[in-house]
Amino acid sequence: MTLAEIAEYANVSIGTVDRVIHNRKGVSEKTKAQILAIIDKYGYKPNVIASQLKSNKAFVIGVLLPYLETGDDYYRALYEGMSQAVAQLSPIKIELKLVTFDRQISGDAIKKSSVFFDGDENAIDALITTPVVQDEIMEIVSKLDGKPFVYIDTPLGTTQPLLTVVQNPYKGGYCAGRIMRMFQGGGKFACITMYSSGYNLRERVRGFTDYIQKDAGSVVLDEICTDITELGFYKFMKDLFERHNDIKGIFVPHAEVSLATYYLVDQGLNSRVTVVGYDLVEKNRQGLLDGSIDCLIGQRPEQQGSEAVHKLYQACMLHQHVPSRIDMPIDIYFKENII
């Protein structure tokens, strides 16, 4: 119920209800108890639009993400989900203040995020981020001075966000291992990542390895390629297969799966080497269609971004309880089930 509806139901003035809600003096105990009983039974929904019109102030959400084009546009999909949520909540005035950083440059997230703390003009009311560089994100959220923050894509258990919107990374990797075994049975497999750190990535690799190594005769190579150019990755794959020409499958636990396929296609290996990876970004979608990628695990980035904005709105503007975690499903894509 709105403030006006509660007042009408209780046969009192709006001002009286407002005093009770904000625990101010000037209301008899009998009237206060009556109003609180109505709120307890029917709930209270603030008139956010009226409040914003009165204050003429938008609710500003800082968004801190790796460069949107990295991850083959995976991070762009996260941000697009947030933008869609803002549009859906119109005419509520919510503003996204986007800051992006290079996750491969140490300290860049801290440096770029300083704009959020640079005086009242750039102040934010809440923050949405992905803790892909954990130590830096921990330092950044410690500066928020009690303002709410939400994690998407990657959890970080040593802090206390309002909400975490993620897929379980270990289960995702475990599922990838099960799929790989369905294609290839046992043998030698390689997990290839392009980043030396990242909780999500390590957990996916761990899950994949645990499933594959249920077969005592199977081996999983844990490989990192830090040169993420097409040429650099091609050379890395060439060296890997010269050292291990009996690899039967490749698992890439992040969105840049297509980079792993160039060498395989060029050398005619894609017919015998299974490729399982993450995220239905456009390049990977095309890889499924042309057969260079066998299976993808999706984690609904647009929905993650949308949930983050909607839950901040509910918690901060409607003062409603929101869950501390939302788990994204493990979506599995083959060539035959994408549109």
Model region roles, listed by residue range:
Residues 1-55:
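N-terminal helix-turn-helix DNA-binding module of bacterial transcription factors
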Residues 46-108:
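Amphipathic helical "hinge" segments at domain boundaries
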Residues 67-74, 97-109, 165-172, 191-213, ...:
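Hinge/beta->alpha junction and helix N-cap segments in small-molecule ligand-binding domains
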Residues 124-145, 208, 226-283:
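Hydrophobic alpha-helical
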Residues 132-171, 281-289:
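Flexible loop/hinge segments that line or gate small-molecule binding clefts
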Residues 164-188, 233-234, 284, 300-317:
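Hydrophobic alpha-helical segments within soluble ligand-binding/sensing domains
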